[in-house]
């Protein structure tokens, strides 16, 4: 007999009247009015009390054995949508979900509803109006805060608006924001007497429609406009979220939060940059500690600091995290010249050039981690920093690093600090490990600061998911100029083509003639036999690398001076043998983008490439007498590309109910072989290359997953 059962049997009997009186006293002691809780002063958690007799109601959840919540996700967090009067809500203007607070233990078992507020006001006829084209003008007399979900443009007419570390002032320029709830959503805050406009983003239609091609892009925006009947909602790409009851179903919205220690350090750094415009800051720390978030807040604070001169508002980002880069596609290191605040997520700006930023120089690791070739990682980082020193030394520099802080990763960080010599090193954790902190502090010549980490409690996308989304977004890009309403806004913005990659005409590149389009294929980390080359690279992501000088091959063994030795496979595909696993010299080469090798036509001897790289760029490189090498390595397998057409043909639209499971932030992301949810609906359509069809409860055999080596081994480990 269990202890619980023993307690129930031995318990002193209580009369029904005594039980009723006890429960009424317990209910009377519970809070009746709205209470304010939370870590932030501007966040309210509203508890609605019930009548005293409601405690006597039997809860179905109590009549059965308690179930252990999966991944610590409490089902009560997903609250039902609440009805809202039309007067208090503008159609096509906002929704979001929130986390529920812990219930009062005195009221455990009672039917309660916990509501978290995200906005300090409601729309009314007095504080807003809807203009032509779905533009919402807000006239706020008091300091307010509110949360907007979706894609929108913001223009300040009077007053100030702050979001994601940026402060926006009256201007004719529209700042464009992408706020999906798979990332932390920024809160908008205003001062007294502020007038602003929220503009629908017509360019967002393409990226929202990527949900038709992959479950990764579904259920991450505001509610589908088609669910509302009003004309305004059909034109809108955003919604204002008032409370957690307004949230889309089955989603957890986390606000972008900056702890007090962060705010203090950010203010100090911005003030220092006024006296020293070339301030350099290196941000490091363990994974999921908030390095990218802090970098984004710092960047936006520098770019919108009003005390700076108008013509000097630019910041250089040295992005050294190949697994989760902010601007360039995954697998690359880049030097980025930024002129506008970063108000979107990485998968909303994966291009190498945009009106808000320009990737000055980029190198490919052909991998999402520096582990395969630490020496190449340091060489690429050194070249990018040298480029900054030669051409952009007068601008502030922010260095973002990967979350690899042990073993070889710690050696790499120490080497980077010694090379860059930043004015300040920020370590985004106060919990060590001591070995890493002491080593980094010793390598730092000037200031070393530890800040508290800010991890996300839950996430609907793992790091592997986000890399896939960023890569998929990159390959669906197309550049265009956009004119919005009557405002002068003709700057180039990103636009996405939501058609499957398999339906597009590929770029045909001859590989066997004397005027072939590429010098050859080059493999990092592993050189397969020539007979297997075609099958090895077909269907994979490759990096297109411009050879600026033949000295780029100086590391390769050569019997004679350059050009390098080029061999051919049985299909006459040219490749550069790399059995010694050496790399191109980054001082004489650069990555111009990524390509997807869709197919190899052995009859016409052409490579079929899908890429957003403009054809003019290829022609410009060839006209200068330079060569292009296609780099093959350990890029993530583009599983999303193989199933796009299947999902589209299955009719799984963006507005369906399939969503990805919410997991903990530190979930193991090494699940590239796991099929996304919703794959069952497309399994019987047709046979597709590189797609394995599993029916029913069928599973892959044991050992079919990719085996990967340990990443934490030291660089100088001899294996003895």
UniProtKB/Swiss-Prot annotation:
Residues 1-91, 663-686, 698-720 are annotated as: Disordered. It is found in: Nucleus, Nucleolus. The keyword tRNA processing does not apply. Its EC number is 2.7.1.-. One of its GO terms (cellular component) is nucleolus. GO terms for biological process: cleavage in ITS2 between 5.8S rRNA and LSU-rRNA of tricistronic rRNA transcript (SSU-rRNA, 5.8S rRNA, LSU-rRNA); rRNA processing. Keywords: ATP-binding, Kinase, Nucleotide-binding, Nucleus, rRNA processing, Transferase. ATP binds at residues 285-292. Gene3D superfamilies: P-loop containing nucleotide triphosphate hydrolases. Pfam families: CLP1_P. Residues 663-672 have a biased composition (Acidic residues). One of its GO terms (molecular function) is polynucleotide 5'-hydroxyl-kinase activity. Its main location: nucleus. It is an enzyme of class 2 (transferase). It comes from the Eukaryota. Polynucleotide 5'-kinase involved in rRNA processing. Belongs to the Clp1 family. NOL9/GRC3 subfamily. This is Polynucleotide 5'-hydroxyl-kinase GRC3. The lineage of its organism: Eukaryota, Fungi, Dikarya, Ascomycota, Pezizomycotina.
